[in-house]
Amino acid sequence: MLFNSVEFIFGFFPIAALVFFGIARRSHMAAAAWLALASLFFYGWWNWAYVPLLVASAAFNYVCGLHLARFVRARRSRAAGALLAFAVGANLLLLGYFKYANFFLGIWGSVSGNASGIGQIILPLGISFFTFTQIAFLADVYRGYVKEYNPIHYGLFVTYFPHLIAGPILHHREMMPQFQEARTYRLNLEAVAIGLTIFFIGLFKKTVIADGVAPYASPLFLNPGAPDLLAAWGGALAYTFQLYFDFSGYSDMAIGLSRVFGVKLPLNFDSPYKALNMIEFWRRWHMTLSRFLRDYLYISLGGNRKGTARRYLNLFVTMLLGGLWHGAGWTFIFWGGLHGVYLVVNHGWLALRRRLGQDPERTTTGGRVFARAITFVAVVVAWVFFRATSLDDALAILRGMVGLNGVSIPATLATYLTPSMRAALDHWGMTFPLGGGSRLVVQYSWIVALLPLVMLAPNTQEILGRFQPALNFHDGRRLVRLSWRPTPAWAAIVATLTACGLLSLTRVSEFLYYQF
């Protein structure tokens, strides 16, 4: 079931919420159990065959967590370490089978010539997210962070539908206290208003913006051929904005849905294209995945404790595996490795500036504009590998982006040029093919309209900042002028966005991160 579907918005969600608050008047535990069962129904709407897998995964990790906690309390460190290794290994084997078996079967098939079995393993929806969430739980138990082991609360923690399909990746210690609080189970009209506002802003981002710009991105990646400069950049930028508003929309909708139930999720998306460098980008993009990779992979590899060279190697390996987490394919591996190189160069540059006695935090306005622009271009280049179906296709698009395939302006647009301008462009090798003029205009109109939005406009969490919309939305932020309040003006704005979002449900599409 999709957040951006009629059956969810007008069926599942209102029923789940009304029954939850109705049951909660008599029993908080029964209400939590209802929400867990409703979440399983939500998951099963996609494919009921994988509901037992989700339940078995939750039961296995819960039992392992109980035994692990006993070993930790008894200070049986060797037994605790062995159980942790076994449980994490079992989770990774499960994830590896469903997510990577087809990839390795494909490699074997290309080597051996035997293609049997390739593509027959279907990836269960959300398996990467609920697996990583539970690995984090096991690690937190081992470290002594987990204090509560109620089985119903744990089941809700794993299956909780606002995060189940595409994140955020949760920590047990940040969710369990909320499931225990009495106020979570009381209907709060302010929380409902805030939650629905965030949800419908997210719906607008997904159905109007992301799905609206998608047709101007997909053709390039489905059949790249030898795109010219304008076609290559147009498609790459269109996808850059499609992915941004798709993931931003999903993140808003997840936070908004959860807020209706009185539960705050961690912030997972924070205007990443405003980043001045790649380090900052990964503090803003898929923030809970970045947190997981840092806490449970980068630090486990040694972090920055074993010298500069080892630190850079750890960064690169972490991002390489982060790319592999996104998908079983060489394009994802290359994307992760490229971001690993970006981070190594970024850290090296900052270290060099410090050695030269410069303060990396101090920069001019022009320097900030340049830093943001070069970071954005680097991200766009990396997205080409992320979206392309093969490395050859990605390289073909990049060749077009650097102008190796020439530049073409549709003949219909060339009619607006003066004869001297057209002659000059023709001299420089520009071609003027027939057709495609209106499409190119619309494509670049989207790009011109969306670029200032992602670079300058406040995001949803900032607009609702005074209400602390997410767990890690820190207090030190300066409130923006465009700040939401329960006023008639804001009601009209949100109603307009809601109407546009709902009217666009005729072209329902999955969120891009559902495939991971």
Predicted regions and their residues:
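Membrane-embedded transmembrane alpha-helical bundles that form the catalytic cores
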Residues: 1-515
